[in-house]
């Protein structure tokens, strides 16, 4: 087997030490003379519709073609102006007002208006579950089909049912069910980007042949295994966009993408499923990049049944896990151990969880907690039923953690493996003691991420921090900082973070501004080809 792996490696890396490129870089470097970016992004975009885009490369194409109220700074992930030049909120952060720029245009020359956003969001809600990220709109009043508030005698007209309202062509007001101080960051997500539709009931996918967009780029066509974008002439900030052309280049698999990069046919490779051996061999190259990706694997306890209703038991099981060993030894170093629920990069300006609050292995304390809970050395503790979906990686992780619980606490574990449909039914029925869950964070908005991580019915601490849905006009006290809620969640440990995924990329040294981040969302608006790049000798 090892011999076969090295044969594969020799094929993958053939020619990488040739004189065609500077030392330390993978493969050939041919500096382009034009502002064209050739991107192998895990395949070709299958949709250009913000409502239907689920993941890269679709979401990357949508971010290039459409602009929302805000965008992310690709480095800090702070919300920066997009179509909106500024925004303000009510004191309780439940009502947000966005002021749109007057020079924002669609690619057909028409003005982008606040009504475009209202219609687009209503359309996404109308599409429903077929739109993969509809749930991100759930905090907007009226998004869940709530009945309209009764009309009072003092009101000249009823309060609009839907919480997004165009006060004028260039002023948009959004009412939320609950306070969200980071709402401007949430609306940077592709699902909030407007589309040119005349009717909010239009649920068909946007057709590429007649696509009208408002972003820095517009769709120019498809040539063989390439989807082509060109800089939009109508974009309000076109002068700051360097790239004239972007080519999404298809590849059959990671080896195909790697071969194209090695020969200089593409400028960047992202979202390729590299094998562990390939990752180890690539790690030494200067153009290889690795970053933490906001995809969390965690274990959730069924705290409605004994003995998992005892926080001491949950804490003991949590700190008996050696996350570093799981990531390094069992997953080949391709993941990052998670001592909390959100990566550091999500915290931004806010305080982060203190070092002493991180979940780390502590064998002696784990044993003491289990003994205090009435199970010294695991005596009398029932066999844990650990439910996972059928997946080789998750099986390896589950078996490793089960072995740690056995060696540290003397507790036996039955790993229950089910196909996805059966797994989901078991989760809904609560037919488990511990269950493997996963979440890909779509935003830096921690309130939204907490809503995705925890269900009110199963996590009282989180439930107490999320008020019941308020009616329009009701006064709601401002929320406590979300990081406090994360701290409380770490104390209660109804769920236990295990590891974050990592994202990997190869980027030619002459490509500037194409940086990775925890959302795996690089900005093509900031990307530039340094046509005069040369290798500087040390």
Predicted regions and their residues:
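N-terminal lobe/hinge region of extracytoplasmic solute-binding protein
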Residues: 39-91, 122, 210-213
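Extracellular/periplasmic solute-recognition and catalytic clefts
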Residues: 220-228, 247-305, 328
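Aromatic- and charge-enriched surface segment that lines or borders ligand/interaction sites
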Residues: 85-136, 173, 260, 307
């Amino acid at each position: 087997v090892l011999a076969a792996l090295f044969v594969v490696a020799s094929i993958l890396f053939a020619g990488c030490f040739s004189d065609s490129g500077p030392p330390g870089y993978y493969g050939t470097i041919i500096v382009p003379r034009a502002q064209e970016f050739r991107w192998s992004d895990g395949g070709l975009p299958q949709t250009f519709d913000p409502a239907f885009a689920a993941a890269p490369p679709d979401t990357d194409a949508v971010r290039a073609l459409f602009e929302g109220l805000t965008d992310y700074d690709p480095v800090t992930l702070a919300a920066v102006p997009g179509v909106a030049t500024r925004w303000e909120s009510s004191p309780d952060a439940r009502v947000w007002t966005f002021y749109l720029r007057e020079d924002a245009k669609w690619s057909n020359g028409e003005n982008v208006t606040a009504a475009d956003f209202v219609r687009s969001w209503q359309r996404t809600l109308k599409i429903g579950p077929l739109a993969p990220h509809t749930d991100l709109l759930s905090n907007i009043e009226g998004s869940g089909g709530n009945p309209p508030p009764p009309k009072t005698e003092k009101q000249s007209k009823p309060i609009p049912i839907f919480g997004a309202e165009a006060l004028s062509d260039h002023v948009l007001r959004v009412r939320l069910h609950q306070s969200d101080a980071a709402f401007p960051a949430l609306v940077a997500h592709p699902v909030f980007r407007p589309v040119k539709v005349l009717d909010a009931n239009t649920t068909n996918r946007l057709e590429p042949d007649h696509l009208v967009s408002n972003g820095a780029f517009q769709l120019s066509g498809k040539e063989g295994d390439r989807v082509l974008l060109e800089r939009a002439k109508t974009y309000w900030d076109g002068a700051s966009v360097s790239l004239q052309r972007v080519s999404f280049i298809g590849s059959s698999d990671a080896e195909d993408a790697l071969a194209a990069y090695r020969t200089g046919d593409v400028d960047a490779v992202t979202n390729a499923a590299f094998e562990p051996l390939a990752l180890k061999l690539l790690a030494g190259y200067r153009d290889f990049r690795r970053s933490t990706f906001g995809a969390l694997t965690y274990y959730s306890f069924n705290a409605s049944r004994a003995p998992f209703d005892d926080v001491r038991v949950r804490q003991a099981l949590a700190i008996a896990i050696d996350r570093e060993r799981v990531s390094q030894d069992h997953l080949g170093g391709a993941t990052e151990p998670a001592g909390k629920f959100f990566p550091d990069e999500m915290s931004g300006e806010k305080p982060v969880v203190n070092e002493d609050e991180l979940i780390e292995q502590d064998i002696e304390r784990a044993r003491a907690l289990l003994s205090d809970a009435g199970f010294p050395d695991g005596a009398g503790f029932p066999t844990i039923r650990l439910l996972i979906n059928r997946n080789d990686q998750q099986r390896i992780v589950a078996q490793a953690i089960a072995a740690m619980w056995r060696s540290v606490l003397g507790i036996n574990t039955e790993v229950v493996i089910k196909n996805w449909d059966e797994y989901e039914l078991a989760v809904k029925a609560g037919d488990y003691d511990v269950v493997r869950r996963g979440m890909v964070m779509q935003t830096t908005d921690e309130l939204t991420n907490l809503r995705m991580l925890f269900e009110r019915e199963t996590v009282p601490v989180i439930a107490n921090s999320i008020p019941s849905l308020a009616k329009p006009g009701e006064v709601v006290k401002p929320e406590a900082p979300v990081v406090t809620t994360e701290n409380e969640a770490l104390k209660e440990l109804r769920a236990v973070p295990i590891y974050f995924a990592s994202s990997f990329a190869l980027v030619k040294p002459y490509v500037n501004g194409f940086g990775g981040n925890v959302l795996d969302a690089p900005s093509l608006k900031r990307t530039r080809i340094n046509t005069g790049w040369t290798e500087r000798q040390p």
